Each structure stands twice: as structure tokens, then as C-alpha cells.
Amino acid sequence: MLITISPAKTLDFESPLATTQFTQPELLKYSQQLITECRKLSSSDIASLMKISDKLAGLNAARFGEWQPDFTPDNARQAILAFKGDVYTGMQAAELFTDDDFQFAQQHLRILSGLYGVLRPLDLMQPYRLEMGIKLNNKKGSDLYQFWGNIITETLNNALEAQGDNILVNLASDEYFKSVNPKKLNAEIIKPVFLDEKNGKYKVISFYAKKARGLMSRFIIQERLSDKAQLKEFNLEGYQFNAAESEGNTLVFKRAEHLAK
């Protein structure tokens, strides 16, 4: 079983590290090509392209300038510990993962990334902001989907083959999973959907849904799941599988309003 998740805009390069294990990203030669393109952009270009403040644009221009691919624990950090968005708040790897959990995650979890393509949890990364959906002109086209082409799909196929089955649990956002070509992916894709109750109606609430993707990732990793039927047992923080609303490989989990944290 292979899990895909999205990265996060919020980064943490300060907290104590929960593991000393690390690996190098597999697609750095492509990252270097993107960095070359990004270095051509001024701060104002970055602000416009990414729709961010001048201050954030200046920070990211500096990051592009300082980026260099000799990654060490002194100038980079493991991806699973560097990202700090809602998905990672739900996963709580730094707080809860054992060494064995990190090793299982290394084989069964992949983070899709605009700059790095595909990151394993223990892959070192330097700070960046480059969302998959932005329009960045490059030698292969006008956006990152054209740049990555089938590279991300092929990398996931290699990971699927290495870990021994063809089940992929898609916990990434649509923006990021659009970088994957399902027709060329050697996998059965499972899509969990998380619905929260609000004023008596169940719907996808972005903050809760993102956190739930992290909770589901943690559940798969800590319980060492290997069978897609086991996904229905997910019950962290009040979510319950709803068979009536699930269809095929779309698994629906619902949570009553009073159980939300």
C-alpha cells in the first residue's frame, strides 16, 4: 500500500529532529532545472506568480538563490519533519512516530512536490515554495504539470513495485494528484473522502479534511496496513466509515459535529 499526500506551505526548520535517519531526494536533477528557471524571476515576478506578499516573495527569492543540492542535516531537513501544514498536524510524525514507523513510512508514503517531484519522508529538502498549480515557464512547457510529465507517475510506479502491491491511497489534493497520470499508474487508486457535520449537514470542510488526511496516513503507518479492506477500520478523532455513501474505491468517512476537535 502506497500513500500519496501533498506538501505544505508552512515549514519548520527549527524544532528538534525526531529522527537522525535521512536519505537524498531521487529527482534532484529535475529540481535543479526548476531552480534555474526560478532564479530568473524577480521578487515582484514571484509575488505576482504565487499571489503572495512582497515580504514572502523576497524570502522565496532568497531561498531560490541559496538552494544548492549538496543536502546535509546541517542545511536541510527530512521532508516529513519540515512540512507543518494541516495534513502534518494530523500525522504528528515528530511527536508520535517510532524509528520503525519512520522506516515503514519511508517505504509506503510519498509526498508530491512542485520542486522535488516526489519526496520520501526521510528525504532531505531545503526550504522552498513552489506550488504544483502555478504557471512557471520552463523548457518543457508553461507549467509544472508539463515539466514533470510522466516522471512523477514513473517514480510512483517504482515505489509501488518496491513495496509489493498495487494499492495506492490518494490523500493528496486535486492540485497535486493532477501531476499523476492514472492511466499509466500501475495501481488501484483508493480515494478516501472525509465529511464533517456542520449545522446538521455533512460536507467537506477544508481544515478538517486536510487534518484527516494526515490522521489516515498515520493510521496506515502505525497499524502497518496492507489490505485495502482495513482502511474501513479508520476511526481516529471520531471519523467512521459510511458504507452507504461509499462507492467503489471512493471511501467516505463521516464525523458528527460534537466529535470535532
Swiss-Prot record:
Which example biological process does GO assign this protein? response to hydroperoxide
For this protein, the record's InterPro entries field holds: YaaA
A single GO cellular-component term from the record reads: cytosol
**Lineage: superkingdom:** Bacteria
> What Pfam families does the database record attribute to this sequence?
H2O2_YaaD
What family does the entry list?
Answer: Belongs to the UPF0246 family.
Protein name, per record:
UPF0246 protein PMI0005
